[in-house]
Amino acid sequence: MKQNYTKLKPNFENIFFEQENDKMILNFGPQHPSAHGQLRLILELENEKIIKATPDIGYLHRGIEKMAENMIYNEFMPTTDRLDYIAATSNNYAFALGVEKLIGVDIPLRAQVIRTMLLEINRIISHIFLLGVQGMDVGALSIFLYCFIEREYGLDLMEDYCGARLTHNAIRIGGVPLDLPHNFLESVEKFTHSVPKTLDLVRGLLDKNRIWRIRLENVGYISQDFAKQWSLSGIMARGSGIKWDIRKHNPYELYSELDFEVPIATEGDCYARYQLYIEEIYESLKIIKQLIAMYPSTPKEIMAKDARYISAPKEDIMTQNYSLMQHFVLVTQGMRPPVGEVYVPTESPKGELGFFINSQGAPSPHRLKIRTPSFYHIGVLQELLIGHYFADIPAILASTNVVFGEIDR
């Protein structure tokens, strides 16, 4: 018998786009331009208000943690670029730091200066990318264009150092692959002068813009207790008055020797988080200027020395038999860290990024677990979106600054 489908009973299994009451089920994504990746939100709306939100993730899942268990430690390093691909060096560094704690090597001072400088350049790239994308999501297209000019300068710096603009592979276990190229510090110094001018321009266009304020203020409010319950970190926590930055409170690399502040806000809304992204860029510029002054007086070594785990300098590999054999073994068979486990947290541009590594003395990790901030920040949407209007989703989603490379691992 032929069925007759009416407006209230469409021919879609288990999906009712229009119902007899005012409620509606709507799919946001997984290919929506404001989704910041492969995000699908299953929304239940009552008129224009969200009464239920269910994030559906996994569209970008690649099994990265399992891949690590089948790769030697150095082989896995380029794969970490594919987590937060907006600030790839932060992933390289977090993994390298975890392995270094496991094998117990000391990093040369110059390598620490270079690594910290690259991390802060990446932080600026990530934050300024967020400002541009948030502006575009809310309707301020010109902000996107101004911010991407500065982002291009930052990517040019990374390209000058490692040859890559997005997936950098710029860190090595035990140090860095290269010293800074000729005139690199001069280019970085120009970058530190141009970024504040762009930020002043952005703030001049947005801070007193009535539409911008209406779209962000009192939208996406997160209280301190709510942030703690959901294990939020980075600006998502600091925007709610939680003064916690791993660089300051559990310092690594050179951060304990550097002068910088941890800006916080108490309002907890999208506008407060927007302000913090800008303030953090200023603090990163302050750190970079200190590192520029510190670099010339450092010894020239850029890699730790431990024949069990780290290859000799290339000059020795080319001229000494023992160094060549050691290098061959490390490349083909891999290092063998001692039995043990370690968890090392770092402050990535998105929040707390940590690697848990369990070693059984083999060339590959027995278990590797990655604690990524975006995973927690996307989960919070199932409560954060409730009560907001559908039009608020792009503004709220942008302020979380999630990237799906580190959510779908």
Swiss-Prot record:
Membrane topology, as annotated: Peripheral membrane protein
EC primary class: translocase
UniProt key word Nucleotide-binding: no
Coiled-coil residues: none
Protein name: NADH-quinone oxidoreductase subunit D
Catalytic activity, EC: 7.1.1.-
Species, as recorded: Helicobacter hepaticus (strain ATCC 51449 / 3B1)
A GO MF label: NADH:ubiquinone reductase (non-electrogenic) activity
Gene: nuoD
Catalysis: reaction(s): a quinone + NADH + 5 H(+)(in) = a quinol + NAD(+) + 4 H(+)(out)
Main location: membrane
Transmembrane segments: none
GO cellular component, one term: plasma membrane
Reported function: NDH-1 shuttles electrons from NADH, via FMN and iron-sulfur (Fe-S) centers, to quinones in the respiratory chain. The immediate electron acceptor for the enzyme in this species is believed to be ubiquinone. Couples the redox reaction to proton translocation (for every two electrons transferred, four hydrogen ions are translocated across the cytoplasmic membrane), and thus conserves the redox energy in a proton gradient.
Keywords tagged on the record: Cell inner membrane, Cell membrane, Membrane, NAD, Quinone, Translocase, Transport, Ubiquinone
Family, per entry: Belongs to the complex I 49 kDa subunit family.
Pfam family, one: Complex1_49kDa
Locations listed in the record: Cell inner membrane
